[in-house]
Regions:
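Intrinsic disorder/low-complexity segments enriched in polar/small residues
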Residues: 1-7, 239, 332
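Alpha/beta-hydrolase superfamily serine-hydrolase fold, recognizing
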Residues: 23, 27-28, 32, 90, ...
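A glycine/proline-hinged amphipathic helix-loop "lid/cap" segment
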Residues: 3-104
Length: 332
C-alpha cells in the first residue's frame, strides 16, 4: 500500500512538473514572443556572467582588472582545433598570432576575416571559433582569425597597422575582392567597420561583405537611451565598456576609426547588421541603420526582439534561423 502511494506521489510530481514546464514554454512563446530556450539562456546569463563594471569610487579596482587581463593577453592562445575539429594552421604576422583553416589554396575561394569581440580587452572564446567555423563550412570559406593587440597595453592604431599588413597579404592571395568577407561581433564588429573605413582612407580594395553581429559602433557608449536597455542586458554594463574605451581610443572616442557610426560609410562592402533589443548596443545599432537608410547605402538590418548581445552565437532557435539566412546570402 505504501509503495503504491509513493508511486502515485511520484507520478503526480512528474505530471505536475511537466504541466509547469509546458505552461512556462507556452507563456514564453505567446507572451514573451521568443523561444523558450532563448528565455532560459538569458536567465542563465544573468546568473553566471559577471559584466565588466567601473565605479568612480574604486578606479584602482578597474585598473587591476585590466592589468590582469593584459597579462593574460601576453600569452599566445591555444590552437582552436580542439573546438572546431578541423586542422588549423598558426601564423605570425608582424608579431600578431593568426589562425587559418579550410584553406583550399584557391584565389577565388571565399575568405572570412573574422575579428572577435571582447571589449578590446578579452581574448576570443570557444563561441567565436565555433560560430565562424559553422558559417565557413557551410559556404566553403577559408577563415583568417587574427588575435589582434588589445587594450590596455595597445591602442587601435597599432592594431590597425598589423591588420593592414595581414590584409595586404590576403589581397596578394585573393586578387578577386568579391571573395573577401569581413565578419565580427561586438568590439570585433565595430573594428570590422572601422577597419573598412581605414582601408578606404588608404585607397585599398574593400571586401564584398561586412557582417556585423551586435557591433560596438560608438565606443563612447553615451547614448541616453542605453539606460532603458541596460536592465535587460546580462552581458554588458555601460560604465565598464565606456571606461575601457578610453584605453583603446585615447581621448577622442567619437572619431570614425574607433566609432564608425560617425564615419563616411559610402563605398564600403555591403553591410549586414544583426542586433537584439536586450542589448545596450541596440540604440546605436538602430542609429547606424537609420544613417545607412538616410544616405541610401545598401545594407541588411536584422533586429530580433528580446535577443541578447551576440545572440547569434547562442544555441537557440533564433540564432539558427538567422545564421542559416546569412549563409544563404553569402552563398550568392
Amino acid at each position: 500500500m505504501k509503495e503504491g502511494m509513493k508511486m502515485s506521489g511520484f507520478l503526480i510530481g512528474i505530471v505536475t512538473g511537466a504541466v509547469i514546464i509546458y505552461c512556462g514554454i507556452l507563456y514564453v512563446r505567446k507572451v514573451e514572443e521568443r523561444s523558450f530556450l532563448s528565455y532560459l539562456m538569458e536567465r542563465l546569463l544573468f546568473l553566471f556572467v559577471k559584466p565588466l563594471t567601473y565605479s568612480k569610487d574604486e578606479p584602482e579596482k578597474f585598473e587591476q582588472e585590466l592589468n590582469k587581463l593584459a597579462k593574460g593577453n601576453d600569452v599566445p592562445i591555444t590552437n582552436p582545433k580542439k573546438y572546431i575539429k578541423v586542422d588549423v594552421q598558426e601564423k605570425d604576422v608582424d608579431g600578431m598570432q593568426v589562425f587559418v583553416w579550410n584553406d583550399k589554396k584557391d584565389a577565388n575561394q571565399k575568405v572570412i576575416l573574422f575579428l572577435h569581440g571582447g571589449a578590446y580587452v578579452l581574448q576570443p572564446s570557444m563561441m567565436h571559433f565555433t560560430l565562424v567555423n559553422k558559417i565557413a563550412q557551410a559556404i566553403d570559406a577559408k577563415v583568417v582569425f587574427p588575435i589582434y593587440p588589445k587594450a590596455p597595453k595597445h591602442k587601435y592604431r597599432e592594431t590597425y597597422e598589423k591588420l593592414e599588413k595581414l590584409y595586404r597579404g590576403l589581397l596578394e592571395e585573393h586578387t578577386n575582392t568579391n571573395s573577401i568577407i569581413f565578419m565580427g561581433d561586438s568590439a570585433g564588429g565595430g573594428l570590422s567597420l572601422g577597419f573598412a573605413i581605414y582601408l578606404k582612407e588608404l585607397s585599398l580594395p574593400q571586401p564584398k561583405e561586412l557582417v556585423l553581429f551586435s557591433p560596438w559602433v560608438d565606443i563612447a557608449t553615451d547614448n541616453p537611451e542605453i539606460a532603458s536597455y541596460e536592465p535587460f542586458d546580462p552581458i554588458l554594463k555601460q560604465s565598464g565598456i565606456h571606461e575601457v574605451a578610453k584605453y583603446w581610443a585615447g581621448e577622442d572616442l567619437k572619431q570614425p576609426l574607433v566609432s564608425p557610426l560617425f564615419g563616411d560609410l559610402s563605398g564600403l562592402g555591403r553591410i549586414s547588421i544583426y542586433i537584439g533589443t536586450h542589448d545596450i548596443l541596440y540604440p546605436d545599432n538602430r542609429l547606424l541603420h537609420e544613417k545607412l537608410l538616410k544616405e541610401g547605402i545598401n545594407h541588411r538590418y536584422i533586429e530580433r526582439k528580446k535577443m541578447n548581445h551576440v545572440y547569434v552565437g547562442l544555441p537557440i532557435k533564433e540564432a539558427r534561423e538567422d545564421i542559416q539566412e546569412l549563409i544563404e546570402e553569402l552563398k550568392k
